[in-house]
């Protein structure tokens, strides 16, 4: 799943229905995400609409290096924080609570980015040959030693070492230059 990137490419090529598809797929989730910052559903909807408008007006800003969903959530977060900063209504929230909200926002952004990275890595792992998939799973997900993985796979330690080396190399190729950061 590309989280809207292919639809956005179709939109850039002139397919207006592709943008509607993006809106249907991502709008509600973006509103919910923004509402977590502003605690006002109507304002969150307005900010989400502005975020999608920004995508149309400033087409060159999205560079396909992250998923479209991640990009929209980053822009939405930024707009939500701007809204909070410039809101004319003075909240009776304590300053310490405001810092906690900002810390939660940063943590939430990290979670969204981490989820996107996990999906990319899991998708790349699924493309590996079976032996490589198994060794990656045993070593990194099951946290087995090379010796334990070798026993499970009925291979010797050197074979496991070689398989893991080739698997990492293949993952870097599949993930592209961003793979260096993910692995």
Predicted feature locations:
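N-terminal module of bacterial RNA polymerase sigma factors
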Residues: 1-29, 36, 173, 183
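Sigma70-family region 2
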Residues: 12-13, 50-67
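Residue-level preference for hydrophobic side chains embedded in well-ordered alpha helices
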Residues: 22, 26, 30, 51, ...
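Conserved RNAP core-binding helix
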Residues: 24, 31, 41-58
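Short helix-capping/turn signature of helix-turn-helix
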Residues: 25-28, 36-39, 137-144
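Arg/Lys-rich amphipathic alpha helix in sigma70-family domain 2
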Residues: 57-64, 74-93, 114
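Internal acidic/polar
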Residues: 90-114
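DNA-recognition helix of helix-turn-helix
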Residues: 120, 124, 132, 141, ...
């Amino acid at each position: 799943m590309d989280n809207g990137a292919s639809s956005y490419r179709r939109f850039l090529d002139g397919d207006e229905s592709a943008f509607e598809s993006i809106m249907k797929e991502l709008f509600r989730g973006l509103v919910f995400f923004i509402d977590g910052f502003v605690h006002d559903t109507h304002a969150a909807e307005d900010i989400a609409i502005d975020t999608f408008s920004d995508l149309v007006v400033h087409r060159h800003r999205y560079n396909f290096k992250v998923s479209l969903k991640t990009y929209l959530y980053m822009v939405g977060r930024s707009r939500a924080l701007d809204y909070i900063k410039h809101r004319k209504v003075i909240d009776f929230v304590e300053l310490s609570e405001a810092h906690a909200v900002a810390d939660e926002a940063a943590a939430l952004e990290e979670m969204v980015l981490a989820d996107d990275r996990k999906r990319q890595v899991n998708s790349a792992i699924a493309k590996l040959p079976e032996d490589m998939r198994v060794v990656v799973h045993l070593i990194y997900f099951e946290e087995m030693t090379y010796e334990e993985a070798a026993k499970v796979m009925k291979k010797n330690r050197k074979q496991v070492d070689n398989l893991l080396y080739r698997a990492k190399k293949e993952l870097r190729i599949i993930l592209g230059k961003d793979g260096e950061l993910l692995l």
